[in-house]
Amino acid sequence: MKASDVRALTADQLKEELAKLKKEQFNLRFQKATGQLEKSSRINEVRKDIARVKTIARQKAAEVKA
C-alpha cells in the first residue's frame, strides 16, 4: 500500500484499514508459529503498512487540532 493511497482515506477508513492490517498481522504470526507461512516477507510488508496508516492518521489528527 502506497502512502498516497493511505492519505486519500478518511479517518474512519484509516481505523478500518488499521484493524484489518492488525488482524492480518496476527494471522501471519500464527502461520509462522505453526510453520504454514509461505511468504515470510509479507510480515514486514504488513508491519510497515501499519506504521504508514498510524503515521498518516496522526498527521490528520494534528491538522484538525491546528
UniProtKB/Swiss-Prot annotation:
Gene Ontology, cellular component aspect: cytosolic large ribosomal subunit
Pfam families, per database record: Ribosomal_L29
Alphabetic keyword roster: Ribonucleoprotein, Ribosomal protein
PROSITE patterns: RIBOSOMAL_L29
One Gene Ontology MF term: structural constituent of ribosome
This protein's record includes keyword Ribosomal protein: yes
Similarity-based family: Belongs to the universal ribosomal protein uL29 family.
Gene that specifies this protein: rpmC
Disulfide bond positions: none
Protein origin, superkingdom: Bacteria
Name of protein: Large ribosomal subunit protein uL29
InterPro entries: Ribosomal_protein_uL29, Ribosomal_uL29, Ribosomal_uL29_CS, Ribosomal_uL29_sf
One GO process term, biological-process aspect: translation
